[in-house]
Each structure stands twice: as C-alpha cells, then as structure tokens.
C-alpha cells in the first residue's frame, strides 16, 4: 500500500518483519500501525487506547484478560479495549499481516470495555469495509474522509458492544442535508471538518453522513472535495500558481491537490493550467 509520504514511516525491518507507524492529524485517532510479522511474538502489555485491528493475511492468536482468542483475516474486525492486558503471536506458519488504528481512550465510554473483553472479534462485513476505508483514508492523508469514516466505524462498533439494539427509525430534523450543503458551499476552503458541520446543524457526524448521502447520492466529504476542486480550477485558469491554489482552496499542499486533481480529471494542476494533457 502506498502511504502518504508526509505521515508514514517505516520504523523497523528485521528478519522479515516490517512495521510502519504514524500519527495522523485526525481527532480521535492516536496512531496507525501496519505490520508484516513472520515470527514475531509480542509479550503481555496494555494500551490506553482502543484498538481496531484488521488482519489481512494469516492468523493471530492472543490472550485478552487471560482468555484465548484469535484475530481472523478478511471477515472480521477485532476491537481491543484500553487498559486490558493482552499479548499476540502468529497462529499460522507464514506469520500475519495486519493494519491497526488506535483510537483515543475516550472515543467509547468505559462502560463498553467489558463487552469488548467478552467478545473482541466482531464478524460484520459492513464494519470491516468501513474500517478498511478508514485505514485507506488515513494512509493517503485524507483527513476529511477519515473523519467521516471514523464516525461510521465508531457508531457501528458501539452498536455491537451495546448488544446490537434494534435501531430506532428517527426522523432527522427537517432539511439537515440542505443546511449542511449550504454550509459547505458557503466556504469550501474554510471547512475544518465534518464534525463541525454536523454540530452546526444539530446532528451527529454519522447521522449527517447518512442523511447527506441519502439526499444527494454522495457523502459530504466527497462533495466538499468536489467543491474545492471547482475553486481550484477557477484559480488555476486565472493564472495562480498551483502551490498557492492548493492552500487557498483547503488542500494541505500541492501534492494533496494533485492527487485529487488526477482522480477527477486524469491530469495535474500544472498541465490543466497550461492546457496540456
């Protein structure tokens, strides 16, 4: 996986074992770790964070609060609570490959720790897809998308840890999606996060994402990127330098603008500005 150059760093290669780790600029996310471990066994320890673990290959055996468990590939998400002792070891001959997102300890209430200890493996395809999408957004440094994905992951995990209660069909306040769109349109480059927009219209981030997507067929973070690209194109055609356009329209830097520009238009900002492909 190509990791964002400004965030990821390879912190260890030894005897076929590799580890990448970085701290993204996303509220609620403490650290991201990717590991390819062939024969590494790690001793009993604790974290002050919640662990969202995706196994992509192999099998991990571990003890959590002195009870044996396994983290399985492809189908499940393992959620380990903070302050609870656990270890880990390869349970397959070729080792394992995993992706881990560590969430701040206050992302979930302490009352859910016991449920996570009792059943850390969550077999939920939707949660697996959302967690993987969160990891990809963090890899690429897409903070807006990561914020949105995180909101959905947190909501889904909490639903499982509270016993999967029947979801009440609550009508959102009238016009949530429309009011959110007005806020995004008013200052696309100045929006700092989806959570702020959700708070402004009086709903949770996950609620806003669902309502907006249902209304417009696109999640709010993707809509916002599109609006920022519209502004960037206008400024580029007016002759502004790409590096200045990037920061003026809400992108972190020119590389961030270029990546989204390529996704939409299959060319770079500089070539677009020059009228070449």
Where are these regions (language model features)?
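Actinobacteria-biased recognition of intrinsically disordered, low-complexity terminal regions
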Residues: 1-25, 274-277
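N-terminal regulatory/effector-sensing and dimerization cores
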Residues: 18-116
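Short, Lys/Arg-enriched N-terminal segment that forms or immediately precedes the first helix
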Residues: 37-38, 161-169, 209-216
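Regular secondary-structure segments
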Residues: 56, 128-139, 181, 185-188, ...
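Amphipathic alpha-helical segments enriched in hydrophobic/aromatic residues interleaved with Lys/Arg
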Residues: 110-169
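Short, leucine-enriched amphipathic alpha-helices that occur as contiguous helical runs
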Residues: 173-181, 225-229
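Basic/polar phosphate-binding segments, predominantly the helix-turn-helix DNA-binding elements
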Residues: 185, 190-230, 237, 246-275
């Amino acid at each position: 996986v190509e990791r964002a150059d400004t965030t990821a760093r390879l912190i260890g290669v030894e005897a076929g074992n590799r580890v990448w780790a970085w701290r993204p600029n996303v509220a609620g996310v403490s650290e991201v770790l990717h590991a390819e471990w062939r024969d590494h066994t790690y001793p009993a320890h604790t974290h002050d964070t919640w662990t969202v673990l995706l196994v992509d290959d192999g099998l991990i055996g571990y003890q959590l609060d002195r009870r044996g468990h396994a983290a399985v590939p492809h189908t499940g998400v393992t959620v380990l609570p903070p302050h609870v002792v656990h270890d880990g070891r390869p349970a397959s001959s070729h080792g394992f490959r995993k992706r881990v997102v560590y969430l701040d300890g206050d992302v979930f209430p302490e009352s859910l720790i016991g449920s996570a200890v009792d059943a850390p493996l969550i077999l939920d395809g939707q949660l697996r897809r959302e967690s993987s999408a969160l990891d990809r957004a963090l890899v690429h440094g897409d903070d807006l998308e990561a914020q949105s994905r995180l909101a959905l992951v947190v909501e889904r995990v909490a639903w499982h840890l509270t016993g999967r209660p029947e979801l009440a069909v609550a009508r959102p306040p009238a016009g949530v999606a429309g009011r959110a769109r007005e806020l995004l349109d008013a200052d696309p480059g100045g929006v700092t996060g989806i959570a702020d927009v959700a708070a402004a219209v009086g709903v949770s981030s996950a609620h806003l994402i669902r309502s907006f997507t249902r209304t417009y067929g696109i999640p709010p973070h993707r809509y916002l990127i599109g609006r920022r690209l519209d502004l960037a194109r206008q400024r580029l055609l007016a002759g502004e330098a790409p590096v200045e356009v990037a920061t003026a329209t809400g992108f972190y830097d020119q590389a961030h603008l270029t990546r989204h520009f390529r996704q939409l238009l299959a060319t770079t900002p500089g070539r677009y500005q020059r009228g070449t492909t």
